[in-house]
Amino acid sequence: MAALTRDPQFQKLQQWYREHRSELNLRRLFDANKDRFNHFSLTLNTNHGHILVDYSKNLVTEDVMRMLVDLAKSRGVEAARERMFNGEKINYTEGRAVLHVALRNRSNTPILVDGKDVMPEVNKVLDKMKSFCQRVRSGDWKGYTGKTITDVINIGIGGSDLGPLMVTEALKPYSSGGPRVWYVSNIDGTHIAKTLAQLNPESSLFIIASKTFTTQETITNAETAKEWFLQAAKDPSAVAKHFVALSTNTTKVKEFGIDPQNMFEFWDWVGGRYSLWSAIGLSIALHVGFDNFEQLLSGAHWMDQHFRTTPLEKNAPVLLALLGIWYINCFGCETHAMLPYDQYLHRFAAYFQQGDMESNGKYITKSGTRVDHQTGPIVWGEPGTNGQHAFYQLIHQGTKMIPCDFLIPVQTQHPIRKGLHHKILLANFLAQTEALMRGKSTEEARKELQAAGKSPEDLERLLPHKVFEGNRPTNSIVFTKLTPFMLGALVAMYEHKIFVQGIIWDINSFDQWGVELGKQLAKKIEPELDGSAQVTSHDASTNGLINFIKQQREARVQ
């Protein structure tokens, strides 16, 4: 594929941007077209609620959207989409298919990898998860002293942690009757020490989530958990009742003391950051029940079907991806804010930090050459309204343009005080996108200050500070209610957005070589931290840091 910057469709887009950028004023665009909302919004209707994607507050015209869709076609998005769904090995650096869509393929249509249908294996693992969840949640599964399981501790990192953690937080209202869940990821001993201090070994079940069962952070934490458990249980055979594995390495799992019957498998065509739909989601299913886990899968499958079959110009993941391309590759935007107005989604932005930045944080193309354009953005965000009192100042009046996605459910899980809290939340959600779009003109600010009774001197002094330029782009994503189905659909929508952008940039969204170098160096440095000898084998900075740490380790601190 030709480089993006040499694609005639991209060059056409860039030329339009250079010639017409100054005309893109959102106030004027809305004034000129009273039907703008209808032209630049989509409503996705499911049997489990509706999703409105309003992209009318973006710096686009119908010409721009047409050119963006033409660019997607020119870059081969439709063909690439089919290659993914057909099980082709689109993860070309690792020679793997990319089939998280198979994990939630509720239609159960055959999906082939190397000529073999993967669906029987997928369904077999789902059946095993269902049976296990029923045993634990019903109290049939007992610990070594005969107690039922009250706490499930997922030990994993990256994709084996972020997805299940985000989902179990998001679906807390659906957890009735399930065990509590805890997540330990960090190698920092504080994480596991603080967690274990709150648990009873007799009623705790540990899930060790590691494909290879060799991930340093995960296995170190798992060994610590086992040591803690055996201090109480004494008998190593009790491990089998309190530890299960999500892995593909039967030998290592057995060595650890876990019964292979309690090993839940997944496959090399499941990438870590796309794995919550697999056995990696066992903690989700235990917490909210397998029926709700299936609803999560069904919502994602609904979005998969929408993504696969809907024309590009009406395709929610495609449109979100193209708007991102417009801002990143024409406007030079470097970050993207995800702002969910729902406290249950407080880990949503953190989840997609990995989802987006590990997928598209690449500068090498499929042909092995360096890109000559920007790729993945820095993704960040916090729940509203907390963010309004923290960083929205920079979004409104800072010097950087930050495209934002605002998300909110129409119905709350907690309609306390006759829905007052949620009405205030909705009002803030609506006000922010309007404020970012409209801003406040000098004349409007002047009238406001006059009405407040400011003296002419104070008015002129304050006036420039009270002006908002506006013209800040946002998407508003409004959905009926945050249910398991709806969460599945939203997560899949963003997954496919990331995929489309990777295709347009001609990078591999499904490897993560950038994770490797630091891990390699850490293995070399770890033994150098032993003893008191000065270290000189690195650059001056790294040597200095190591030697300071060694010196201070023995220092007495009051």
Curated annotation (Swiss-Prot):
Q: Name one GO cellular component term.
A: secretory granule lumen
Keyword annotations of the record: Acetylation, Cytokine, Cytoplasm, Disease variant, Gluconeogenesis, Glycolysis, Growth factor, Hereditary hemolytic anemia, Hydroxylation, Isomerase, Phosphoprotein, Secreted, Ubl conjugation
Q: What is the effect of changing residue 375 to R?
A: In CNSHA4; GPI Kinki
Report the outcome of residue 101 to M: In CNSHA4; GPI Sarcina
EC category name: isomerase
Kindly provide the PTM information from the record: Phosphorylation at Ser-185 by CK2 has been shown to decrease enzymatic activity and may contribute to secretion by a non-classical secretory pathway. ISGylated.
Q: What is the effect of changing residue 75 to G?
A: In CNSHA4; GPI Elyria
Under which pathway is this protein filed?
Carbohydrate degradation; glycolysis; D-glyceraldehyde 3-phosphate and glycerone phosphate from D-glucose: step 2/4
Query: InterPro entries from the xrefs?
Result: G6P_Isomerase (IPR001672), G6P_Isomerase_C (IPR023096), Phosphoglucose_isomerase_CS (IPR018189), SIS_dom_sf (IPR046348), SIS_PGI_1 (IPR035476), SIS_PGI_2 (IPR035482)
* Protein family membership: Belongs to the GPI family.
Which positions are catalytic residues? 358, 389, 519
* Gene Ontology biological process terms in this record: canonical glycolysis; carbohydrate metabolic process; erythrocyte homeostasis; fructose 6-phosphate metabolic process; gluconeogenesis; glucose 6-phosphate metabolic process; glucose homeostasis; glycolytic process
Q: What is its EC number?
A: 5.3.1.9
Protein name per Swiss-Prot or TrEMBL: Glucose-6-phosphate isomerase
In-chain residues carrying the UniProt-annotated modification Phosphothreonine: 109, 250
- The N6-acetyllysine modification is found at 12, 142, 454
The associated disease is: Anemia, congenital, non-spherocytic hemolytic, 4: An autosomal recessive form of anemia in which there is no abnormal hemoglobin or spherocytosis. It is caused by glucose phosphate isomerase deficiency.
Which of the residues bear the PTM Phosphoserine?
Answer: 107, 185, 455
Positions where N-acetylalanine occurs in the chain = 2
**Locations listed in the record:** Cytoplasm; Secreted
